[in-house]
UniProtKB/Swiss-Prot annotation:
Keyword Oxidoreductase assigned: yes
Keywords: NAD, Oxidoreductase, Tricarboxylic acid cycle
Record-linked NCBIfam families: MalateDH-SF1 (TIGR01759), PRK05442.1 (NF003916)
The protein's name: Malate dehydrogenase
Function: Catalyzes the reversible oxidation of malate to oxaloacetate.
Amino acid sequence: MTTNNQNAVTVTVTGAGGQIGYSLLFRIAKGEVFGDRVVNLRLLETEQGVQAARGVALELADCAFPLLGEVSITTELSEGFKDANAVFLVGAKPRQKGEERADLLAANGKIFGPQGKAIAEYAADDVRVIVVGNPANTNAAIVAAHAEGLDPRRVTALTRLDHNRGLAQVADKLGVAVRDLKNMTVWGNHSASQFPDVAELTLNGEKVADKLDAAWVNDEFIPRVAKRGAEIIEVRGRSSAASAASAALDHMRDWVNGTAEGDWVSVALPSDGSYGIPEGLVFSFPCRSVDGEWEIVQGLEISPAQQERIDANIKELQEEKAAVEEAGLL
């Protein structure tokens, strides 16, 4: 189906032929993020990934989604980001065995820098960008730094997966439904240092921190959420794909349509100095989406124990930033 519907939304997905892209695209085309708006999809791939993207495009056509408009495949950034209203930056170089994190940061910087420049030049003025490819926080910082003229708050990184993992772990521990839990927070970096925080988490409006044993929170919950990706690789033999895609959809849907009443979610975005986080550092905060814009939740009390974990994330992200600066990518 091809349409010139004036209310259509253009969505770009990089790494569209990969596992996460495959899990993402059909749900976007079905209307899970943008409601009843027609969706035009731009599948942006490397030369090596084009064939897989073609296969995805064939399957998208075979689904006969009523809301699916045009589907295009390209390797050119100018074509891939043209008039994009929403961008999912999924494609990234995976870490190889024996590779140092600094090497990974430098390699991905060479991918995300040009993408940031092209987004600023070719995407729609209202573009919303979510970086899924790891290391997501620092990749997002690189995108924002190269997207000259674009409001840095239009560029975010995915920590909703960690947020969702935290909700699932607490729901399982308490024997309750995930839907009854609100105000989970993930602070910091999408890495093993992240701080999933239950201090403000509520069950049917009542805080649950007192119902959770401190030893379980510190020794089991926090490490398990932080290392869940490695656990899934160990069990499944592949990295998280469907859950990562689902979290990215949650993130974009809430950004566009607003967060649920009385709840907040976790979003990594350039800091405005809130909670003492250095300005500009891409850091995960508790956020609400209001009128299509992310707002950091203010006024939460931070204990010394919480601050220690937050500080560890600041340190790690500053070290990542220094590594890409040294490589001339920031």
